């Protein structure tokens, strides 16, 4: 019988984040903490692990899921004392950049799209089209803000003000996270 000695080597775990960051909505799958938590935990489990590498190709998406994913990676990195490195493929924009900033270092091609620290909300207004064809919109609610920015009703200045306020708070939170993680890099 022959015996072979195997040398224990260092390990680097790799996690691919490709696509839109979003909660699961039926059959539509996005990058989210529900689907990636176990994978993230496994990446930090190996005792010979010298680093965890995030490969990101995402235009962003849900700020909530972006923050959940980034926080989980940051917390495990601190807990296990394992550095995190991000490689950006084509794009790490908005929530994709939020996720990339969970790393200690970020590497990208000169052609990669990185950044876009902002908040966007979009919709359509169908109220004039409905009026033109003689359709009345009827909404019955109990409580405030239940039909906020309803696309079938005319825009309401108070609704827009409330949305802008929410966007501003989220944008400030996003900027503070990036500043904390990236500093003056």
Residue ranges and their predicted role:
Residues 1-81, 91-98, 103-184:
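Small-residue-centered hinge/linker elements
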């Amino acid at each position: 019988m022959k015996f072979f000695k195997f040398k224990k080597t260092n390990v680097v775990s790799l996690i691919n984040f490709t696509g839109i960051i979003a909660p699961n909505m039926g059959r539509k799958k996005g990058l989210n903490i529900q689907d990636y938590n176990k994978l993230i935990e496994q990446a930090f489990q190996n005792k010979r692990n010298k680093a965890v590498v995030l490969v990101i190709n995402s235009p962003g998406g849900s700020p909530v899921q972006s923050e959940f994913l980034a926080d989980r990676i940051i917390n495990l990195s601190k807990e296990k004392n394992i550095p995190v490195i991000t490689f950006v493929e084509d794009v790490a924009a908005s929530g994709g950049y939020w996720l990339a900033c969970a790393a200690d270092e970020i590497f990208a091609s000169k052609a990669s799209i990185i950044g876009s620290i902002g908040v966007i909300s979009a919709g359509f207004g169908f109220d004039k089209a409905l009026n033109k064809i003689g359709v009345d919109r009827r909404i019955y609610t109990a409580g405030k803000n239940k039909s906020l920015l309803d696309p079938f009703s005319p825009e309401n200045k108070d609704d827009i003000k409330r949305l802008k306020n929410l966007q501003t708070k989220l944008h400030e939170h996003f900027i503070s996270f990036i500043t904390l993680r990236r500093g003056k890099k």
